[in-house]
Amino acid sequence: MAQLMEGEISLNQPDSGNLARTRFYVCPACGNILFSTGGASVFCCGRKLEPLSPLPRENGPAIMIEQIDGEYFITADHPMEKGHFLSFAAYVKNEQIFFTRLYPEQNPSFRFPLFPGGTLFLYCTQHGLTRYPNIR
């Protein structure tokens, strides 16, 4: 912050546009969800946010994937209580990101377009981000 106040700006490297390097951020104060496709200084509620470090799928909730009408219908085995729920699901494939916000007391199921081979991310408010690569 001092550098910014003194007129010094540190520039990031140009974004290569590779969505496989997408980083997710969640504000601990307000729950705001942000993402970047490259290196970024992300702030919310006056705090600098660090990118979430995804856990491997073995550490996350079990998921069931069905192919229905040209889409993935995904259900997660996870509680959806006010203090412990899945906050979002994101599916990243090539140059596209599909994002669904989830809420407490809602069913933990969602749909994404059928693009095999992408990566699914689920964010739990208590346990963090889980990465599920190579969805088929």
Outline where the language-model segments fall.
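Short metal-binding segments enriched for Cys and/or His
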Residues: 49-63
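Cys/His-rich microdomains that often coordinate metals
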Residues: 33-34, 48-49, 128
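Short, flexible, mixed-charge glycine/proline-rich loop motifs
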Residues: 15-21, 33-37, 115
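Residues immediately within or flanking Cys/His clusters that coordinate Zn2+
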Residues: 24, 41, 121
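Cysteine-rich micro-motifs
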Residues: 38-49
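Exposed aromatic-hydrophobic patches
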Residues: 73-77, 107-115
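Short cysteine-rich clusters marking metal-coordination/redox-active sites
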Residues: 27-30, 44, 124
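Edge beta-strands of extracellular beta-sandwich domains
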Residues: 126-136
